[in-house]
Regions:
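A short, basic N-terminal segment
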Residues: 1-37
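Conserved catalytic network of the ASCE P-loop NTPase/AAA+ motor domain
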Residues: 32-35, 63-65, 94-102, 129-136, ...
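Walker A/P-loop nucleotide-binding motif
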Residues: 34-55
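Conserved catalytic segments around the Walker B and adjacent sensor/switch elements
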Residues: 38-41, 59-77
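Short glycine-rich substrate-engagement loop in P-loop NTPases that contacts/grips substrate
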Residues: 73-96
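Conserved P-loop NTPase "ATPase switch" module shared by AAA+ and STAND
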Residues: 74, 95-120
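Sensor-1/coupling segment of RecA-like P-loop NTPase cores
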Residues: 114-119, 127-156
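Conserved small helical "lid"/interfacial subdomain of P-loop NTPases
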Residues: 167-174
Length: 174
């Protein structure tokens, strides 16, 4: 993205939203630093809020030398999550991890709430079995639907139960 595109995108986001996004970005990058690596999840109240968060988190990560990849799952959720699952090393990733490994990539997964019901959660089962041990990636799961995200991460019968910490700002929770 060029500086001009980024400036144009910033100009369209209301200032209070930018301030929230910038504060969030600072917190999430500190939270996701390689020594901790706890996956996180965030529910955004709007497309504008989501884009502001993505922009702010990307800037903060790049400033710390963390590569970032944004993947929009919404066009084909199952296929795209399966493709991500194939990239994961599972146990091998943990065994091969050493101080000389490259900086892990921050994966920002947009539209993760697509898996938030019984009819769409099948791809989350193989994903969890490999994702929980992966050390190549840092994780930020984004969604728009609070109930679906809670179903995914807070329901004890789901494969992603407690797999990512909730970091949605209080004023964005509904």
């Amino acid at each position: 993205m060029s500086d001009r595109d980024d400036s144009a995108r910033k100009a369209t986001v209301p200032r209070p939203l930018m301030a929230i996004a910038e504060q969030f970005a600072s917190n999430v990058i500190n939270f996701l630093t390689p020594s901790f690596r706890s996956p996180t999840r965030l529910v955004c109240p709007s497309d504008e809020a989501e884009q502001a968060v993505i922009n702010a988190v990307t800037r903060a990560a790049v400033a710390r030398g963390i590569p970032v990849e944004v993947i929009d799952l919404r066009p084909a959720p199952a296929e795209r999550l399966n493709a991500i699952t194939e990239r994961l090393d599972g146990w091998v990733s943990r065994a091969a991890h050493s101080d000389s490994d490259p900086m892990p990539t921050l994966l920002i997964l947009r539209g993760f709430d697509a898996f938030g019901d019984d009819t769409h959660d099948e791809p989350t089962y193989p994903f969890r079995s490999r994702f929980q041990f992966d050390r190549k990636f840092l994780w930020l799961f984004l969604g728009r639907d609070t109930l679906r995200m809670r179903f995914l991460f807070d329901s004890h019968s789901r494969p992603l139960y407690r797999a990512a910490g909730e970091i949605t700002p209080e004023d964005w929770q509904h």
